[in-house]
Amino acid sequence: MGEKAVPLLRRRRVKRSCPSCGPELGVEEKKGKGNPISIQLFPPELVEHIISFLPVRDLVALGQTCRYFHEVCDAEGVWRRICRRLSPRLRDQGSGVRPWKRAAILNYTKGLYFQAFGGRRRCLSKSVAPLLAHGYRRFLPTKDHVFILDYVGTLFFLKNALVSTLGQMQWKRACRYVVLCRGAKDFASDPRCDTVYRKYLYVLATREQQEVVGTTSSRACDCVEVYLQSSGQRVFKMTFHHSMTFKQIVLVGQETQRALLLLTEEGKIYSLVVNETQLDQPRSYTVQLALRKVSHYLPHLRVACMTSNQSSTLYVTDQGGVYFEVHTPGVYRDLFGTLQAFDPLDQQMPLALSLPAKILFCALGYNHLGLVDEFGRIFMQGNNRYGQLGTGDKMDRGEPTQVRYLQRPITLWCGLNHSLVLSQSSEFSKELLGCGCGAGGRLPGWPKGSASFVKLQVKVPLCACALCATRECLYILSSHDIEQHTPYRDLPASRVVGIPEPSLGTGAPQDPGGTAQACEEYLSQIHSCHTLQDRMEKMKEIVGWMPLMAAQKDFFWEALDMLQKAEGGGGGVGPPASET
């Protein structure tokens, strides 16, 4: 029997050493071991090709190990391969300092999550992710569907549909998608919080128009296209002169007098009025585009962004100033507490808000608003009947009032009678805070609401950046753009300690007597309770009312639960249901 030659297979050990640190000495001299191979001996193209197969999360973690892997993992060639794997249809990397890395992260982190307020399931669900979408820039839920705009101007139509799950037919949200249109810049619908009013979708887009009939030459012109939200059918289109370019559109007013506000690239506001009740009729319309009074009487102002509601509009300038338009006396009284300066014959005249610092972004509800300045401070103003201002009480505010226990939010949203704040709780987690009316489950975990911002029972995605709530559902948009960062500044030391903050608009120092009076009232309520258990429950409610941070409230509630159990009360763990 002849011997069969078997080749000797040796496993060679590859040493992952940082080239900047150099190879370790004395390893080759060890007996009984093969010669190690440093990864620095591999060609850079081979190393980039190997690590491009890693998931994005692992690639980022590998880049934090040493200087060599940081440079390799940060190479555009690696991110180009990852981007083409995540979005095979994407061929143009776009613009920017790091276009391929930005595109890859946009497509890796994109996602739309929603949580229904009713029903048994109290967890986030994820909508269908369109393969053609290049990241998610903004979204808008309507009565039946959800619309999403990506970073290349494609507007997607996410439909609700009946699907079969384990042999059972179920109605699911945003589980099918189609492309509504391309070349979109912005879109808007009825600004009211109730989605039942959002019948039409107004899309600001760019289209190629022929310069002269019968010729092949064309030029880009901005236009507004109107679609039915139920079917996605286009019912109306208006085209503007090629010299006018817009970047944002919002709506204000009733259906019969719907005003479209258009923001130009130069920061000017134009408006036109349409009658929505006649849009489904096949006929031609002539509309007049006019300069809004905020740009006509204040031509030096350059508006950076705007937001609207049914009866009011808020403008934020590039210098951080805020100007208001209020069109009804009821909303004006809720926002400012008086009708002294309201002129029913001149509703477009802008009103300037007195603020201590530059405003970065804002949110506008039906009769209250929220502002965030350059130092990350949150200011609330308006009606506070349900505690939607988050000040710890239910007193209306006719001027911006700081919510002192919240800092540097990611985004802010104001609804009909409640408010939501997306906050960064730690480096690797985010939390959702809410205040106001909790009826219908709109504040998960707080069925009877809260007069101060409390942590909601919602598992927030790591890259959450925007949110919106309807009567039936909470929506959270996930996306991360490496080129966009909120430029918060550190508050000067003179404003932190030692010097009382002046009251906004009046210049008078704030009176802390309101807090002392509230504490006396709380003690009076505790004293009126007859048993220790009743006093414990009342103290839990008071903790929910007080303007404390979410972690502080959790601490006090946990401590009160421990004391209550020690006395034999056996109270349930968790926050109480405070009155609205």
UniProtKB/Swiss-Prot annotation:
Ranges of the RCC repeats in the UniProt entry: 376-425
Gene3D superfamilies associated with the record: 1.20.1280.50, Regulator of chromosome condensation 1/beta-lactamase-inhibitor protein II
Pfam families named among the record's database cross-references: F-box-like, RCC1
Positions of the F-box domain: 36-82
Phosphoprotein is among the record's keywords: no
Keywords: Ubl conjugation pathway
Disulfides per UniProt: none
Record bears the keyword Iron-sulfur: no
Protein's job: Substrate-recognition component of the SCF (SKP1-CUL1-F-box protein)-type E3 ubiquitin ligase complex.
Subunit-level organization: Directly interacts with SKP1 and CUL1.
PANTHER family attached to this UniProt entry: F-BOX ONLY PROTEIN 24
Protein name: F-box only protein 24
Species of the source: Macaca fascicularis (Crab-eating macaque)
Lineage: Eukaryota, Metazoa, Chordata, Craniata, Vertebrata
